[in-house]
UniProtKB/Swiss-Prot annotation:
It is found in: Cytoplasm. One of its GO terms (molecular function) is structural constituent of ribosome. The gene is RPL20B. GO terms for cellular component: cell surface; cytosolic large ribosomal subunit. PANTHER family: 60S RIBOSOMAL PROTEIN L18A (PTHR10052). This is Large ribosomal subunit protein eL20. The keyword Iron does not apply. Component of the ribosome, a large ribonucleoprotein complex responsible for the synthesis of proteins in the cell. The small ribosomal subunit (SSU) binds messenger RNAs (mRNAs) and translates the encoded message by selecting cognate aminoacyl-transfer RNA (tRNA) molecules. The large subunit (LSU) contains the ribosomal catalytic site termed the peptidyl transferase center (PTC), which catalyzes the formation of peptide bonds, thereby polymerizing the amino acids delivered by tRNAs into a polypeptide chain. Keywords: Cytoplasm, Ribonucleoprotein, Ribosomal protein. Belongs to the eukaryotic ribosomal protein eL20 family. Component of the large ribosomal subunit. Mature ribosomes consist of a small (40S) and a large (60S) subunit. The 40S subunit contains about 32 different proteins and 1 molecule of RNA (18S). The 60S subunit contains 45 different proteins and 3 molecules of RNA (25S, 5.8S and 5S).
C-alpha cells in the first residue's frame, strides 16, 4: 500500500445570477487523503484561475486507480519546486508499475537530493512514456535494453547440511 493516492478533483465558482452555470475546473492531484487533495486543489486553483475556496465549491472528488498495476512502465514527470535559492523547473523519469509509485519515488528523490519538501513541490504533468525513443535520461535508458542481465554476487550454495562444524563463508 502506497502513502499517496491520485485524486481527480472537480470544482467551480459558486453560481450567481449573472453566471448560473460557472466553468468547471478539473485537476489530478497526488495526496495522502481527500482532505489534503481538496486543500491542494484550492491552492492551485487560486494561483491559476483566481478562484477562492470562499467563493467556490467542490463538485466531486474521485480516486483514480491504475489500469494495469502489474506492468512496469516508464513515467516522465514535469515539476517545479521552491528551494532556498529560488524556483526551479525540472523533468525527471522513473520506472514503476503505477503513476502513484513513480510520484512517490520522485518526492523521495527530491527530498534526498535537493531537500525539497512535499509542500514546495508542484507537479505540472505526469506522462507514461510508451516508446523507448521518448526516454531521455540515461539512468532509465540502461534498463530498456533487450536482453538485460543482472549479476548474481554473493551467492549461497543450494544444498546445505543441517549442522556445520565451521562458521559458513559467504564469499564464493
Amino acid at each position: 500500500m502506497s502513502r499517496l493516492n491520485e485524486y481527480q478533483v472537480i470544482g467551480r465558482n459558486l453560481p450567481t445570477e449573472s453566471v448560473p452555470e460557472p466553468k468547471l475546473f478539473r485537476m489530478r492531484i497526488f495526496a495522502p487523503n481527500t482532505v489534503v487533495a481538496k486543500s491542494r486543489y484550492w491552492y492551485f486553483l487560486q494561483k491559476l484561475h483566481k478562484v477562492k475556496k470562499a467563493s467556490g465549491e467542490i463538485v466531486s472528488v474521485n480516486i483514480i486507480s491504475e489500469a494495469k498495476p502489474t506492468k512496469v512502465k516508464t513515467f516522465g514527470i514535469w515539476l517545479r519546486y521552491e528551494s532556498r535559492s529560488g524556483i526551479h523547473n525540472m523533468y525527471k523519469e522513473y520506472r514503476d508499475v503505477t503513476r502513484v509509485g513513480a510520484v512517490e519515488t520522485m518526492y523521495q528523490d527530491l527530498a534526498a537530493r535537493h531537500r525539497a519538501r512535499f509542500r514546495s513541490i508542484h507537479i505540472l504533468k505526469v506522462v507514461e512514456l510508451e516508446k523507448t525513443d521518448d526516454v531521455k535520461r540515461q539512468y532509465v535508458k540502461q534498463f530498456l535494453t533487450k536482453d538485460l542481465k543482472f549479476p548474481l554476487p554473493h551467492r549461497v550454495q543450494k544444498s546445505k547440511k543441517l549442522f556445520q562444524a565451521t562458521a559458513p563463508t559467504t564469499f564464493y
